[in-house]
């Protein structure tokens, strides 16, 4: 899967750091576990060895995934993002039409940078998909697992 992903400079650097830790620390730890398990003798019935090999497989898959993401990433400059419509890296101020006009703010980011605790939602999430391309004043109706959400877009800006 070679889909291009869009990241901020910070998001790109976080993925690079995660990859560095996996390659230079985690990989070595797993190899040590495998060596220790091998030292216990018969590998045919060695659960510790099997677990270490499984951990190695997962670690290598994670490394390959991060390498792929980093190689296909486009780093976006927030200064270049337009605010005429909702795009990736724009922040939107929304009025929740179901909760007495409660104001909500989200920043749309790639799946790799999404963090709902920080108000960063993925452009691939139901809310993100519904907001992309919309303009100030538009009302959106969004189907989510908990039901239906209704928002009005009040403002589009870049932080």
From Swiss-Prot:
Gene3D superfamilies: Transcription elongation factor, GreA/GreB, C-terminal domain (3.10.50.30), Transcription elongation factor, GreA/GreB, N-terminal domain (1.10.287.180). Pfam families: GreA_GreB, GreA_GreB_N. GO terms for biological process: DNA-templated transcription elongation; regulation of DNA-templated transcription elongation. Transmembrane segments: none annotated. InterPro entries: GreA/GreB_C_sf, TF_GreA/GreB_CS, Tscrpt_elong_fac_GreA, Tscrpt_elong_fac_GreA/B, Tscrpt_elong_fac_GreA/B_C, Tscrpt_elong_fac_GreA/B_fam, Tscrpt_elong_fac_GreA/B_N, Tscrpt_elong_fac_GreA/B_N_sf. GO terms for molecular function: DNA binding; RNA polymerase binding. The keyword ATP-binding does not apply. Residues 47-73 form a coiled coil. Keywords: Coiled coil, DNA-binding, Transcription, Transcription regulation. The keyword Transcription regulation applies. Belongs to the GreA/GreB family. PANTHER family: TRANSCRIPTION ELONGATION FACTOR GREA. Necessary for efficient RNA polymerase transcription elongation past template-encoded arresting sites. The arresting sites in DNA have the property of trapping a certain fraction of elongating RNA polymerases that pass through, resulting in locked ternary complexes. Cleavage of the nascent transcript by cleavage factors such as GreA or GreB allows the resumption of elongation from the new 3'terminus. GreA releases sequences of 2 to 3 nucleotides. This is Transcription elongation factor GreA. The lineage of its organism: Bacteria, Pseudomonadati, Chlorobiota, Chlorobiia, Chlorobiales.
């Amino acid at each position: 899967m070679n889909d291009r992903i869009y990241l901020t400079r910070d998001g790109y650097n976080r993925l690079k750091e995660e990859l560095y830790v996996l390659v230079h620390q985690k990989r070595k730890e797993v190899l040590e576990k495998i060596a220790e398990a091998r030292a216990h003798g018969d590998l045919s019935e060695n659960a510790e060895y099997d677990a270490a090999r499984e951990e190695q497989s997962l670690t290598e898959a994670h490394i390959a995934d991060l390498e792929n993401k980093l190689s296909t990433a486009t780093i976006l400059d927030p200064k270049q993002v337009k605010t005429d419509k909702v795009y990736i890296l724009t922040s939107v101020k929304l009025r929740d039409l179901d909760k007495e006009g409660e104001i909500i703010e989200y920043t749309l980011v790639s799946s790799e940078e999404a963090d709902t605790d920080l108000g960063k939602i993925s452009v691939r999430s139901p809310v993100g998909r519904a907001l992309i391309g919309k303009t100030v004043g538009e009302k959106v109706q969004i189907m989510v697992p908990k039901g239906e959400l209704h928002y009005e877009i009040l403002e589009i800006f870049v932080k």
